[in-house]
Amino acid sequence: MDFEQLLDKSLNKVREEIKTELSKSLDEAIKLLNEGHTKIIQEYTQRINELITKTKEEIEGEKARLEVENKRTLLVEKEYWINKVYERVLEKIGEVVKTKEYKDAIQSILNKEIKEIEGEKITVYCSPNDKSTVEKVVGNNKNVTIKTDDKMLGGIRIYYEGSGLTRDFSLKLILDQVFDSMRGKISDMLFGGK
């Protein structure tokens, strides 16, 4: 074997070793690239999922806040219209106090209360419009004092001086009690009910 052949053989062997090493290095580089790529994809997928979850939570929170705000707005609007009904009823009291049934009811309450006082002094408060009706029932009874109250819309309020108790038969109080007990029904009539 001559020198050239030996050199060729040697070169071929070195070439094969270099080629093998390059192939191994290339495979290792591809493996590292694939691992890095997979790791980056996993990392960013996790970040994207976290952002999606956070955004969903924010959207749900905003949705809940808006629902509460809408309910509050509806309640305010309902209350406004219920109060409008109440105001209309108050306006109608002027018509009620002119009826015979109203005057008969005042007389009946007063007659019953005066019979039960047995000498105790009482003060009867009434609206200026009801004073003549109250005076008719009281007559000359010395135990009864009549006072007008401009704030009263109708009805009477009786103060028992001996016991310090007051019995309130004023139309405003009765109306308030009836209205409060019927608030749900009024709401159902106005806005559709259950």
UniProtKB/Swiss-Prot annotation:
This protein's name: A-type ATP synthase subunit E
Assembly, per entry: Has multiple subunits with at least A(3), B(3), C, D, E, F, H, I and proteolipid K(x).
Keywords assigned: ATP synthesis, Cell membrane, Hydrogen ion transport, Ion transport, Membrane, Transport
Gene3D superfamilies: ATP synthase, E subunit, C-terminal (3.30.2320.30)
Record Pfam families: vATP-synt_E
MF GO annotations: ATP binding; proton-transporting ATP synthase activity, rotational mechanism; proton-transporting ATPase activity, rotational mechanism
Alphabetical list of InterPro entries matching this protein: ATPase_E_C (IPR038495), ATPase_V1_Esu (IPR002842)
Topology within the bilayer: Peripheral membrane protein
Family membership noted in the UniProt record: Belongs to the V-ATPase E subunit family.
Presence of the UniProt keyword Cell membrane in the record: yes
Primary localisation category: membrane
Places the protein is found: Cell membrane
Function: Component of the A-type ATP synthase that produces ATP from ADP in the presence of a proton gradient across the membrane.
Gene Ontology cellular-component annotations: plasma membrane; proton-transporting two-sector ATPase complex, catalytic domain
Family annotation (SUPFAM superfamilies): V-type ATPase subunit E-like (SSF160527)
GO BP annotations listed: proton motive force-driven plasma membrane ATP synthesis
